[in-house]
Amino acid sequence: GGGWAVERMRHEPDQGQDQLGDLVIGRLEGSGSKRVLMIGHTDTVFDTGTVAERPFATDGDRAFGPGVTDMKGGLLTGFFAVEVLQAAGFEDSGRLTHFCNPDEEIGSPWSRETILAEAGRADAALVLEGARENGDIVSSRKGVLDVRLEIEGRAAHAGVEPERGRSAILEAAHKTVALQALNGRWPGVTVNVGVVHGGTRPNVVAERCVLEVDVRSPQEATFAEAGRAVEAITNEHTVPDVTVRSIGNGWHRPMEKGEGGAKLAALATQVAAELGFDLKDAATGGASDANTTSGAGVPSLDGLGPIGGDDHGPREWRDLSSVVPRISLLAGLLSRLEGI
């Protein structure tokens, strides 16, 4: 409804891959010249069956349920904001694309190329993730690099001939200390070795160990430097004769608040003031599809959904009293984009 031309792309998984939901793109032509890309995701982090265990519920001004703020609220905000403008007879927005992808929570590996293609045709990107708990919208996000290091040594009996062994766990320990030591080297850059698993028995020198590492940076330059530092630690061995394989498990470029993003944030603040509420923009360490649009050079603004919190957790909530103000905010923003 609402005049949207809808395109639906079916995911064809490779062998061993999970089947993702459809990628759905709605397009609406207005009389304005600006091309606006709105992005929301249809997937959540929760396992099948979670809704049966914890169905949608409300308590006063709060709604609870899996994905209620991340990000069913934002998805609907996009549609309702356009409905509000249509009901008001406003037809001066330009070409509007509402992009609904099914794989954001795993880093948008399938939809990213299509996001980049759409971003290449857009003057602005509005990402509909939930607003922060304090109501802030999001103008910058850290870039994220996930790396898996697979370390292989040589097994040996720890009591009989330990000298023949080459401990993958010892090498992993050295690398863990070196990686964690990168924290504080650059402003805002964090490195976390979040998963370690290796070895088989206490009396065997460990042949294998795996590290999973999370690297985050607020700026493109330090993101690249941190990536090179991780690579150097990967390639520098303390234990002789070990081999290390580095596998990239996904990445997002930083969403930096450039001139275009700052203009969008200022416009949103102005619209909110006219609607009668204060609005601030903030930086956050988590990534979203706004990292992709911003990295492609498109002025981007995020956190435009309703207020919510405890994303990914059992008490995930949405502030119902924020729904109408945030729909109004997005509608106002869409109606003013011709002016920037």
Model segments located where?
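Flexible, glycine/proline-enriched loop segments at strand-loop-helix junctions
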Residues: 65-72, 101, 158-166
